[in-house]
């Protein structure tokens, strides 16, 4: 009887450990299409006062990221800042510009996903002054992305991908950064689901990643 009770306790502990280690990565999208995903969508998105669509509760990039995950069956992970950016548009601009100028590496909230089993990473972010938000670099520098294929996508208000793909390629020469990234206006991502889906479909097809 003692042996059985001990075994049950050990099994429960193992189950709890496995559950806790996976809690930061949402695998619901991949489970709808296949049992194991070989790709993950990693994104940073900002909420609050937006340049073109007012106050938003779900970021523009988040909306695109979820479409990509649903269409590819990829797992999904959101990069969240330990110290949230201001909700005010002007205040957020001031903070983000200073981070860019200082090449800051903002702290990320929570644990990062283990990318070992993901050869493909869809990387999403808003284009802030021609570059990725500095917190995206924080994530990449803390993750092992050597040899991985990085597929960038971004939201913007007129500047497209800017220099983001080239900057990523230069900063992480050990990874395979795809220069043919997806760029979508934030207002489109926020207000036009059909156009967003169409743009994602076209991009995935160009990469040979459509289902």
Language-model-detected regions and their locations in the chain:
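Bacterial N-terminal signal peptides that target proteins for export
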Residues: 1-8
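C-terminal motif of bacterial Sec signal peptides marking the signal peptidase cleavage site
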Residues: 16-19
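N-terminal beta1-alpha1-beta2 submodule of the flavodoxin-like/Rossmannoid cofactor-binding fold
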Residues: 21-118, 130, 198-211
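Solvent-exposed loop/turn segments at secondary-structure junctions
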Residues: 46-49, 81-85, 127-131, 156-161, ...
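Structured segments of extracytoplasmic/periplasmic soluble domains
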Residues: 64-71, 75, 124, 138-143, ...
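Short beta-strand elements in bilobed, periplasmic/extracellular small-molecule ligand-binding domains
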Residues: 75-76, 175-185
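Helix-loop-strand module that forms the ligand-binding subsite of alpha/beta enzymes
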Residues: 87-174
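Post-His helix in hydrolase/transferase enzymes
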Residues: 194-196
């Amino acid at each position: 009887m003692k042996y059985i009770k001990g075994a049950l306790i050990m099994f429960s502990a193992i189950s709890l450990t496995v559950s806790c280690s996976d809690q930061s990565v949402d695998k619901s999208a991949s489970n709808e299409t296949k049992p194991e995903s070989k790709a993950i969508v990693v994104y940073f998105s900002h909420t609050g006062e937006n340049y073109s669509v007012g106050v938003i509760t779900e970021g523009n990039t988040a909306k695109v990221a979820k479409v990509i995950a649903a269409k590819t069956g990829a797992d999904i992970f959101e990069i969240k800042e330990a110290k949230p950016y201001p909700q005010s548009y002007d205040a957020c601009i001031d903070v983000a510009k200073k981070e860019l100028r200082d090449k800051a590496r903002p702290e990320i909230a929570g644990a990062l996903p283990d990318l070992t089993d993901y050869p493909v990473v869809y990387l999403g972010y808003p284009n802030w002054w021609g570059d990725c938000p500095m917190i995206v670099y924080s994530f990449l520098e803390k993750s092992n992305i050597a040899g991985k294929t990085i597929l960038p996508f971004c939201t913007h208000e007129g500047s497209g991908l800017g220099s983001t793909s080239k900057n990523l390629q230069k900063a992480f020469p050990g990874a395979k950064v795809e220069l043919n990234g997806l760029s979508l206006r934030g207002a489109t991502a926020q207000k036009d689901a059909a156009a967003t889906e169409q743009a994602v479909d076209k991009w995935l097809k160009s990469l040979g990643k459509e289902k």
